[in-house]
Amino acid sequence: MGIREDMPLLARHEGVWDGTYTYYNAEGVQVDQHSSRLLCRFVEGEHPYHQTNHYTWPDGRTEIREFPAAYRDKRVWWDNELIKGSAWEVGQDDKARTVMLTWERTGDPELYLYEMIQLADDGQTRCRTWHWIRSGKLETRTAIEERLVTCDWRKVEAEMAAGG
């Protein structure tokens, strides 16, 4: 079986998601906020899951990050210059809403992150929470609210490449 069959919940995330990332320090004070557009793709090849994150800050700064992932053992796996980790569906979630993810920053073994992703039953919205932990202590929390723009990531990717 392949990634879509083994991870049907993750497969429901395929598409283009627009949202907002809000970061809080350990004391709960907001320290950053920016908008996002994520392209979540399932493709053939060495990296059957590939996510591209486009970030935009209110001051005009932008950033694009690529996250190609391998697939094995009913998980997607990242190992690149930024992160090393994996994501899996929570089998005990009888509503099939929850994906978990953990990773470490490459070159910073003291910092690791756990993410919980909740997909709404209608598949149109999702919320994600990150807990950044350094040396066993909470450093940052990130709250992400997203809505599905379209499942047709190929069309949006082509429009973005054409400057549209």
Please provide the spans of the model-predicted regions.
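Central antiparallel beta-sheet cores of small beta-barrel/beta-sandwich binding domains
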Residues: 28-114
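Beta-sheet ligand-binding and adhesion/scaffold domains
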Residues: 76-164
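Amphipathic/hydrophobic helical signal segments and adjacent flexible N-terminal regions
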Residues: 1-64, 134-164
